[in-house]
Amino acid sequence: MANPDSVTVRKVETQADFKAFFEFPWKLYRDDPNWVPPLLSMRRHLLDKNENPSWEYLEGDYYVAWRAGEPVGTVAAFVNHRHNEFHNEHISWFGFFECIEDQYVATALLDTAAAWGRERGYNALRGPQSFTNMDECGLLVDGFARPVMLMPYNPPYYQRLVENAGLAKVMDTHSAMANWDILHEAGAVDRVNRIADRVKRSQSITVRGLERKNLKAEFELFKDIYNHAWEKNWGFTPFTSKELDALVKSLGSFIDPELACFGYV
């Protein structure tokens, strides 16, 4: 195992630093057939403190671990003030944790994130999370297959690195998957079809597709439904109006109105 003294964790302060942070996953996962790279534009928007509206209530820094002049890991240390207010907690977070299979590097990164929080008076570190619960969150510990959109993916060794660095599980979450054959075998498709038939026959339930000409109003309706439906879920924080505007901008151009439906009772 490498000498820990050869690992240096530095805050991202220059364009070159940011480039190393931004591009590191492509270096780490280049030989992993299950990794699905994010859209460059979406990752850039997510990390840009001037573009991502979530930074209205976030405070944080990015870090890169270096060895022999090469990046070997990344982490973001941040506080989500909106989460703390909504859940009456006093915690900081880590996210965008990516690391070679090296315990020294992982511990150095996570210790840096923990120290960042302690310096600001936060008594616990939680993660990984890509800023909010609406982004990728959680550490994959089982089912290392190609993920669907917005589901986290990481190498199996991450669990060992994180736990050996002193962190412990706070909550079990589940990653979604889309496999038509499994859904059929489980009878899920038949159940959905039966429910759909009952809805069609019902006089008290109506379903309509999204109206593209009123896109902003439709997304505002979605925000109200989403915030109400999820308000008691662990880790949830409500959408803000500016986050909704960003969602309209990112999804509005390619969303299929026939697949985005509203139900009324």
Segments (PLM) and residue ranges:
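Conserved beta-strand in the GNAT
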Residues: 64, 70-79, 262-265
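Short amphipathic alpha-helix that is part of the acyltransferase structural core
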Residues: 2-50, 201-243
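Acyl-donor binding region in acyl/amide transferases
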Residues: 85-168
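Short alpha-helical segments and helix-capping/turn motifs at coil-helix boundaries
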Residues: 46-51, 58-62, 78-80, 104, ...
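Acyltransferase donor/substrate-recognition loop-hinge adjacent to the catalytic core
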Residues: 3-7, 155-234, 259
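An acidic- and aromatic-residue-enriched active-site/binding cleft used to recognize and process polar
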Residues: 68, 78-82, 97-99, 130-132, ...
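A short helix-loop-beta-strand connector motif used in the catalytic cores of GNAT acetyltransferases and
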Residues: 48-64, 249-261
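Short regulatory alpha-helical segment in sensory/regulatory domains of signaling proteins that mediates
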Residues: 117, 227, 252-255
